[in-house]
Amino acid sequence: MASRVSDTGNGNENKENEGTVASDHSEARCSYILFEAECSDGGDDEESMEDSLVEDLVDDASVHQGNSLSLFHAQTVEEYEGEIQSLKRKFILSPLHRDVAELSPRLAGVSLEENRGKKARKSLFHDDSGIDSSAVEVSQLSSTPSAPGPDIRLPKPSDIDLEPLFQSRQRCTHMYSKFKAVYGVSFTDITRPFKSDKTTSQHWVVAAYYLAFDSEISAMEVLLRQQCQFLYIDNNDGIILFFLEYNVQKSRTTVYNWFTANFHYNENRMLANPPRTRNMPAALFFYHRFMGTGGIKHGAMPEIIVNQCVVSNQQTDTFELSRMVQWALDNDLQDEHMLALEYALLAESDGNARAFLKQNNQPMIVKNCSIMVRHYKTALVAKMSISQYVNKRCLDHGEADENSWRGIVHFLRYQGQEFLPFMCKMHNFLHHRPKKSTLVLCGPSDTGKSYFANGLNKFLDGHVLSFVSNGSHFWLSPLRGARCCLIDDATLTFWRYADQNMRALLDGYEISIDAKHRNPMQTRAPPLIITTNEDIMRLDEFKYLQTRTMYVYFNKPFPLKGNGQPLYYIDGYTWNSFFRKFWRHLNLKDPEDESDGETPGTIRLYTRADTDTI
């Protein structure tokens, strides 16, 4: 390799010499290596670079990436929708649905078909994914031109954020606090908590959270009008408040199912309880909402609200025992449990009943009312003659069929009894003739003795004696105040007991009856109806009872139809027709001749006054 000649004093000469040396030795050597680059002050290099045809290998310009995430999202959605389109041919709305939407969005919200929404699915992207609103929008291809339609339920950021909250254990706390923040009153202060979802009520207060659109509320109004006497709907800050007075009573489960079936609501986002019926602040809250201009109202205001807000109703809510006793007498109620229940149910329309429910000593009031009713009824019945009493019992059974009495006559003939002797025994029985006031129905089993006797005793509102309680000193206490009495299925043991201890009772004379916690009371023995399988007329040991009883024999089996029903139907209405038909034959007098212008068996304890609503 040739040595390089270097001269620092003259740069140009060195350059020329180097080129000469290189050219001279190019043929003899394989390559020429330049170890250093020489600096030069000239501009020849720049000019040569401008004339070069080699492009830059590195681009240092700023590069804009673009919204690739939005594009990927759009492509993913388009691919997914394409797969769904191939599987479900009804995915795209038909032109008919679009025409209905163009005519009226409200009309499109009302449909008789089941609204089948898309099932929830897991998605990689949500609407609040952080993509800026100014990102590139990818238009969705459609075979038909777009048209305005009804509100479509799309997942909203508020729905996505609140869904875990409504699924948590604290959802009720959040819902109660949200309701109080919006309406200024707690939901529990205006409603009664029902622990069971099966308990029914006619009035319901429903609060729905973040569920409905305006078109759905209009559809609700149309559908609820068919089921409710009164409805109120108010949409305020994401909470829809319903006050519903249904035509019939419904349970919480039924209310939830209706909203779920028609509008696909989630039960976790709803509260439902009946309103408070005896709470003035709650009534004023609803009254203020109903009288306002906001919300949707339909129908007359419920009575449970009017009764608490009207002045006249508040002024008359003072309890009077006499009014309760009068009501019990008019409705023929004297059992304590029935008195308490029926009078409590009357609270919606009667001020005295509402005042009764506000009392703290309701058991004592019910007991006193039952005692007073029993005293009044006993005294009224004791004052009546037998004609007045039978007429009252006929009136209590209402209008009778004119020909139903024939069933009694045909049954007696079927058993071989002559009608005239039976009428004589009935005459003595009703008029309480001494030694002729005990009617005995005797015969084998299954001959209709008890059926016949119970029908007559029930019509006369008689009492029942059970010999099974003869070990007690008070087993004869039902005889007090009774117009007749029934002893069913008497055996030889009873007849021996009656022969020793009850001869005066069978005679129909005055007897002394021992009652619990009372002194023995003297009263006249009522007429008796006795059914038995023992014919004491053929036994000499009962000769003292044979003159005190009137026997009627039933020897044939009781006739039945093919379906098991009695051939001769005998009940209270049949006896009503019987006594009306043979009134004169039984020597019963006209009630108007004995009453002296007064209706027997009635009493007026207080003067009823009409109150006008202010």
Curated annotation (Swiss-Prot):
Motif segment (Nuclear localization signal): 88-90
Motif Nuclear export signal, residue range(s) on this chain: 103-112
UniProt-listed SUPFAM superfamilies: Origin of replication-binding domain, RBD-like, P-loop containing nucleoside triphosphate hydrolases
Domain of life (superkingdom): Viruses
Binding site for ATP: 443-450
Molecular functions per Gene Ontology: ATP binding; ATP hydrolysis activity; DNA binding; DNA helicase activity
UniProt modification remark: Phosphorylated.
Region span, DNA-binding region: 154-316
GO (cellular component) term, any one: host cell nucleus
UniProt modified residues of type Phosphoserine: 94, 104
InterPro entries on file: Helicase_SF3_DNA-vir (IPR014015), P-loop_NTPase (IPR027417), PPV_DNA_helicase_E1_C (IPR001177), PPV_DNA_helicase_E1_N (IPR014000), PPV_E1_DBD (IPR046832), PPV_E1_DBD_sf (IPR046935), Rep_E1_papillomaV (IPR016393), Znf_lg_T-Ag_D1_dom_sf (IPR037102)
Protein family membership: Belongs to the papillomaviridae E1 protein family.
Protein name: Replication protein E1
Source organism: Human papillomavirus type 41
